[in-house]
Amino acid sequence: AAVPTAKPATSKDIQGATQTGTPTFEGATVQVNGQDKAITIKDNSYTLLDKDGNEVATTPAYAEDGTTEIGTYSIDPATGQVTFTPTDKSYTGKVTPVKVQAESSNGIKVDTTYTPEIVPVTPTATPAETTDIQGATQTGKPEFKGGTVTVDGVEKTVEINDDVPATFDDGSTTKTVDGVGTYTVAADGTVTFTPEKSFTGKAPAVTVVREDKNGTKASATYTPTVT
């Protein structure tokens, strides 16, 4: 019998990104009564196989451990293109492959795999310091930047999520240190320090936390000095 061939597909992209891959299925040629006869891949026969081997259009995607659900796979039955959509955007690394199947015009089903890989991205943060005279209110803003990695020669960035307000490292937005002063952090990460009138010297640092659009956090300190 003429058996079609199947070659797996892989893809790699940054944390949080939707990925696609299209395994290659090819028909075969068989001789019938001295004549070459083409065996083709049947139209709209592309399908996924779930964990139990059932033909499905969508199926959960699992982490490398094979049990933790981290996204979904779906397939275009006309083209065989598989889409991986992450739902747990904190996960990075290899994803358990999904089985992809097609059927030949002579009714033979063959399958192969599609395997996405997720490259981790971590935001960066730079501390801030300010100095002012006794009694003066000071403001400082640690700098947060989305992490950037290069995937297959292309630079990709996960931006800081401006919809999630900055906080201090304990989740609060206001801190008071007796005998020193009060710190408040704004949504954009700007810290306002209001010193006690009698305080001079270097005040304790406070840690500001922000996160990117995958929920990956970064932190940096702000340190005011009163002269």
Model-predicted regions and their roles:
Residues 1-38, 97-156, 205, 213-227:
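Extracellular interdomain linkers/hinges and stalk-like, low-complexity segments
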Residues 4-6, 44-48, 70-75, 123-125, ...:
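Generic structural motif
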Residues 15, 48-49, 81, 134:
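Generic detector of leucine side chains in alpha-helical contexts
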Residues 25-26, 46-48, 104, 144, ...:
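Aromatic-residue detector
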Residues 28, 51-52, 94, 121, ...:
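Low-complexity, intrinsically disordered/propeptide-like segments
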Residues 40-42, 76, 109, 119, ...:
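Residues marking helix boundaries in flexible regions
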Residues 58-59, 64-112, 173-220:
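Acidic, turn/loop-rich segments in luminal/extracellular domains of secretory-pathway
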